[in-house]
């Protein structure tokens, strides 16, 4: 888990057969507790691995605004059926994006929630790209999607960690040893980030 500045807040090694949302509380709750009372607002964005009603209820209970990717299903696609039909004529030469807002309640949810759909027709493609986000934000749909899309920067930080510090190089014979090794990799990552910031000239010194 990263914050908006690229700081690695928390990481954990888990078995390959474990769902990505399992154990979410051991990752998310300590980070929220660390920031509670120190910042005025906390926002959370995540991929579909955190699409879990327990996560939603925890964030809502803590007053945290969130935008979480929601896996597509037949019911969601039926709600935006009119946006999934391609216009008659030649495919567009430029991307066309449409947004939809609606309330939705999955079987395990205790209440309906706001869902935003983004439908994108790209030049040269026969079928649209569709994404769903569940959110408790009151922002316009385009703004919520833009906020969630910044999660892609986090993916880049993960790639950098894999390339520079070899996060995924865990050759130990035991799971526990590899878990410790991952934490050492995380510490090395944050040490590198801190050194880079200390070396970066301030605006006052550069005159900018």
PLM features: what roles do these ranges have?
Residues 1-38:
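Electropositive, glycine- and tryptophan-enriched low-complexity nucleic-acid-binding patches
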Residues 6, 42-51, 66, 133, ...:
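Short, conserved catalytic/metal-binding motifs centered on acidic residues
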Residues 16, 47-51, 71-73:
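Active-site beta-loop-alpha junctions enriched in small/polar residues
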Residues 52-57, 77-81:
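A short acidic (Asp/Glu
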Residues 56-65:
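Short, surface-exposed basic-aromatic patches at helix termini and helix-loop junctions that form
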Residues 65-166:
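An anionic, glycine-rich sequence signature occurring as long contiguous blocks
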Residues 123, 172-182, 206:
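Structural motif
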Residues 191-208:
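A short, flexible helix-boundary coil/loop motif
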């Amino acid at each position: 888990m990263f914050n908006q500045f690229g700081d690695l807040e928390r990481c954990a090694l888990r078995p390959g057969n474990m769902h990505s949302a399992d154990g979410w509380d051991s990752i998310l709750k300590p980070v929220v507790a660390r920031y509670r009372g120190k910042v005025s607002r906390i926002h959370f964005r995540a991929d579909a691995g955190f699409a879990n009603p327990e996560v939603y209820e925890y964030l809502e209970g803590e007053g945290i605004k969130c935008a979480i990717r929601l896996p597509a299903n037949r019911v969601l696609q039926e709600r935006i059926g009119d946006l999934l039909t391609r216009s008659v004529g030649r495919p567009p030469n430029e991307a066309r994006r449409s947004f939809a807002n609606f309330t939705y309640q999955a079987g395990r949810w205790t209440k309906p929630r706001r869902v935003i759909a983004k439908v994108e027709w790209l030049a040269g493609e026969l079928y649209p790209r569709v994404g769903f986000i569940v959110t408790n934000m009151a922002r316009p749909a385009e703004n919520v999607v833009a906020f969630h899309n910044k999660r892609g920067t986090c993916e880049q930080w993960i790639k950098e960690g894999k390339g520079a510090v070899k996060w995924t190089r865990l050759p130990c014979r035991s799971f526990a040893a590899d878990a410790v090794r991952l934490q050492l990799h995380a510490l090395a990552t944050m040490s590198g980030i801190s050194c880079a910031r200390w070396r970066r000239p301030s605006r006052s010194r550069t005159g900018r």
